[in-house]
Amino acid sequence: MQRTRYSLAVFTLGLVLAGATSASADPFFFSTGAPDGRMGAASRPESHGKLEIEAADDFILESQTHLEGASFTGLLFQGGPGEIRQVAVEIYRVFPKDSDVTRTSGAPIFSTPKVPTRVNSPSDVAFDTRDSADGTLRFTVTVLGYDFPAANSVIDGIHPIPDQATKGEGPVQGQEIRVDVVFDPPIDLPADHYFFVPQVTLQGRGGNFLWLSTPRPPLAFLGDLQIWIRNADLDPDWLRVGTDIVDDATPPTFNGSFSLNGTR
């Protein structure tokens, strides 16, 4: 009987400690804000003869964080929400982490034969991923508007130097959607600077998901970078959507519309 009471006491103490640990976790939330209609950047897994495209925007974690979900807002160009077949999220660290620096020119520019610079770009390879195709991500789609315009777009015009400065592919319109995702399992990230890459596959060859931009600045956070993009032909390098592709006299810069939630 004494041994049983001791075991029960240990078990109860374990539950109390577990509850205390759970209760001590602080909620985490990060958001770049609502779309501004300036830019739509394609971002999709490889499928049906389409090259993979990755559009990436950054966020900073000041402590170990347990990411449980995310939301991102985009435009369905020549497609509808019923045609969405796959959603994926990739997390990258900032170059030169997870990257082969020897293939670049080195400091301070870190250029390659394909791109002007890798400074402040995402790394060569992803740090972690979640994908509805393998069951590690669940998603829901909400239509926010049926005729949302974006003043410029980047879809197919992602080229290595010297042809990178296409100025973009012009205005587009389509359904504005918000994609809410749950990570299963959650993504555990140590304190660091990261890039968030949302990707959406639409059925068929014509449609594309375009990630919508948000204002930058004055709403940028300290250390904020800008949207970078690449396709499978440019991999492992990246281009800046503003500055490299839309290289106006005063180059624009863009953030992507997304939010993250979890605990830390």
Show where each model-derived region lies.
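Bacterial N-terminal signal peptides that target proteins for export
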Residues: 1-11
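Bacterial N-terminal signal peptides
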Residues: 9-19
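Boundary/junction segments of secreted and surface-exposed precursor proteins
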Residues: 23-48, 103-107, 263-264
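Non-catalytic, beta-strand-enriched accessory regions in extracellular/secretory proteins
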Residues: 46-60, 255
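Aromatic- and Gly/Pro-enriched, solvent-exposed loop/edge beta-strand patches characteristic
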Residues: 52, 76, 82-223
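Extended extracellular/luminal ectodomain segments enriched in beta-structured repeat modules
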Residues: 62-71, 82-84, 191-192
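Short, surface-exposed beta-strand/loop patches at domain edges
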Residues: 188-193, 197-264
